[in-house]
Amino acid sequence: MNKEQFDVNLVPTWRQGYRFQFEPAQNGFVILYPEGMIKLNESAGAIGQYIDGTNNVSAIIAQLKQQFGDIPEIDNDVIDYMLVAQQQHWIDLV
């Protein structure tokens, strides 16, 4: 799937064995999985907070725009994150 074909009605869910959380020792959000940990940058952490298995990508974009203002790049940033996260097997898109 590429960015032009991406369906913002898809709902991202964390894959089994992957857990998103704030890690004080890392001073940021991380994804924990059986083999280790991925430290997320601030933007990825902001997006990850809204992945709850009920919000579709469009709703996540709307919530981030409400939180940070109507920044045009938010749409592309969220879609890029979803594509990378799916490619890395962190999330499923259903």
UniProtKB/Swiss-Prot annotation:
Q: Signal peptide location in the record?
A: none
The pathway is: Cofactor biosynthesis; pyrroloquinoline quinone biosynthesis
Q: Which UniProt keywords apply?
A: PQQ biosynthesis
Q: Which GO terms describe its molecular function?
A: quinone binding
Q: Which Pfam families match?
A: PqqD (PF05402)
Q: Please, which domain of life does this record's source organism belong to?
A: Bacteria
Share an example GO biological-process annotation for this protein.
pyrroloquinoline quinone biosynthetic process
Q: Does the keyword Calcium apply?
A: no
UniProt lists the family membership as follows:
Belongs to the PqqD family.
* Assembly and interaction partners: Monomer. Interacts with PqqE.
**What the protein does?**
Functions as a PqqA binding protein and presents PqqA to PqqE, in the pyrroloquinoline quinone (PQQ) biosynthetic pathway.
Q: Which named protein is this?
A: PqqA binding protein
Which organism is the protein's source? Acinetobacter baumannii (strain AYE)
